[in-house]
Amino acid sequence: YSTIGYCKLQGPLNLVQRNTEPLIIAEFDYESHGLEDPRIVKIEEIYYVTYTAFDGVNALGCLAVSKDLIHFEKKGIIVPTITYAQFNQFTNAKNSANSKYFRYNQHNGMVEQDGKKIFIWDKNVIFFPRKINGKFCFMHRIKPEIQIIVAVTSLTELTAAFYNNYFMNFNDHILLSPKYDHESSYVGGGCPPIETPKGWLIIYHGVKDSIDGYIYSACAALVDLDNPQIEIARLPYPLFSPKKDWELEGEVNNVCFPTGTVVFKDTLYIYYGAADEKIACVSVSLSGLINELMLNTKKNDN
């Protein structure tokens, strides 16, 4: 099963260390079938590593924290553990979820598998790299849209009661919805947000169904610095899509899945999973990307 490894780069591309042993492994039942898609940010001297844990039935967002990237304390599942019936009940109370949510998340009507309750899959948990107005903020994804949790002073606030109210007002927490052809099936988080003078740069993934199956592309959007629920701009085309042989064919075909970035001067390097088999990198001018986004602001939409 999947584990989280460690490597070290000198500069953006020169690999100088790759550990032979996993950095984070499964210890609990909720992650017994793998730990996937890690993202990492540093907030006030603490590293926050979010990942998707799979127990053979459910895939849910989890958190581990560290001060030194050697010793990690697992905080467990931080997304709601909610069944389809509960999701339906809460969101229907105020008509706050579109019909696509129910098509993607009903698990063919099953409520239990292998003796475990089936929960709504909630993945792609990604923290903003600093507190906003003194509070934590993170993205997560229940198909087909990217949602956002804003204004949590402490992660201990993420209780069942908190999430019950969250789902009662679900529409208020939608960050990005599928909009263009390349993301017409669903969208999901990619890299930790990058702070720029124009707003938070969000590199995410968009998915389109095709005759050859789903195609995963990297996408870009810009949201407000003080209120990240406000979308400023979005590229109407993929930032990059599967083109190379090793992106088109692999464990999962047709996948470019961005999860990390680094900025050197004006160059943004984006690290991504290629066909679920390889780690690859692309680069783009950061200022050029922001300028292109500003040509595609919401007010300029046709």
Where does each model-flagged region fall?
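Beta-rich carbohydrate-recognition and catalytic domains
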Residues: Y1-H33, K42-V125, R130-S185, E195-E251, ...
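Short glycine-rich, acidic/polar surface loops and turns
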Residues: W246-L248, C256-G260
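Beta-rich, blade/repeat-based domains predominating
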Residues: P38, V125-P129, G190-C191, P258-V263
